[in-house]
Design a protein with these regions (language model features):
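A hydrophobic, helix-centered structural microdomain
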Residues: 5-81, 152, 194, 199-245
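Short, glycine-rich, amphipathic interfacial segments at transmembrane boundaries or analogous
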Residues: 53-106, 165-183
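Short, cationic motifs built from Arg/Lys/His that form the positively charged side of catalytic pockets
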Residues: 19, 58-60, 64-74, 107, ...
């Protein structure tokens, strides 16, 4: 087990066993990913014509930027400023990190909230794992404008390879605050081991079920008490992508 105080300049080295597991798991999952992509391509023609994928710049290991892939779950050319304001509020207030689609954000395409809550929209990040930009387990990469709001100590969560799932994701995720997320991610970096990765992977499915339930309840409550967010259209390339989790 690795135990030391990591930093951006002295990050956690990526163990050989972790890279081996990442590549092996991705190769096994590729047929499932290909089939799901085909289904998404067909469904998207009816739900929201446009590209199935979008690319978005994210900040990951050691603060490096890379292009992150996701299934598109929002309308084409949706405004990103809405999410930026929401993100700023979560960081400054340190309130529970509620996602905007839990508030019936109308930028989200039909059924998109379920893809986001279940994590299925992040399946294309298997490509990022194969490319070496991400791992199966690790802190979530963030968008650049979010990274700019981080204090130096908060950026320590980027001293471990970003992942599809992680300690924060299985420890309450949207029920936690920004500071709790940072604490959990730094703890993961300081205690990196194959056993911790295995426990996180085993805890991921139950955590996703809870997240779907929480999002469903939040959407129902939002529909009864507050108006939905109105979409704002901006002129940009659809492949730019939109801020996400």
């Amino acid at each position: 087990m690795i135990r030391f105080t990591p930093s951006i300049t002295h990050p956690v080295p990526v163990p050989g066993w972790k890279r081996f597991v990442d590549v092996t798991a991705c190769m096994v999952a590729l047929p499932v990913f290909a089939l799901f992509t085909l289904v998404m391509t067909l469904v998207m023609q009816f739900a929201s014509p446009g590209p199935v994928f979008f690319r978005q710049e994210r900040v990951g290991y050691r603060g490096r930027r890379f292009m992150c892939y996701k299934f598109r779950t929002m309308i084409v050319d949706a405004d990103s400023q809405t999410h930026q304001r929401h993100c700023d509020g979560m960081i400054l207030s340190n309130a529970p990190m509620t996602k905007m689609d839990a508030r019936r954000d109308s930028r989200v395409i039909p059924g998109g909230w379920l893809l986001r809550a279940s994590g299925l929209d992040e399946l294309p990040q298997l490509i990022n794992v194969l490319q070496g930009d991400m791992s199966l387990v690790g802190p979530r990469p963030c968008v650049p404008y979010e990274y700019e709001k981080y204090l130096p100590r908060q950026r320590e969560r980027f001293c471990a390879m970003p992942g599809l799932t992680g300690l924060w994701q299985v420890s309450g995720k949207n029920r936690t605050t920004f500071e709790e997320m940072v604490r959990l991610d730094v703890h993961y970096a300081q205690n990196l081991s194959w056993w911790l990765d295995l426990k996180i992977i085993l805890m991921t499915a139950p955590a996703l079920v809870l997240q779907i339930s929480d999002t469903s309840r939040a959407r129902k409550s939002s529909a009864e008490n507050t108006p939905v967010y109105a979409p704002v259209i901006r002129a940009t390339n659809a492949s730019d992508g939109l801020p996400g989790s």
